[in-house]
Amino acid sequence: MKQIRFSKHALGYTASRGFTVAEVEDAIRTCAWAATELGRLDCRKDFGYGREWNGKVYATKQVRPVFVDEAGEIVVITVYTYYF
């Protein structure tokens, strides 16, 4: 199993986008990967949420990491978070 490393950019958005490192690692390890632009990959995982985010209560939080699969590690470039 490859190590997952987070870029400074990705880590800088944990609070403002509302994701955790554990959620991103879980998504990468358990969900299907899809090719995106510039040779990158992404995946999506829904998590039960049921809390307030920016003044509204959402039932689900979806975490979508964008990453590259390098020879010795997986590098997370950025993470998008969707609430619905």
Question: Model regions: which residues?
Answer:
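Ribonuclease/tRNase effector modules and their secretory precursors
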Residues: 1-84
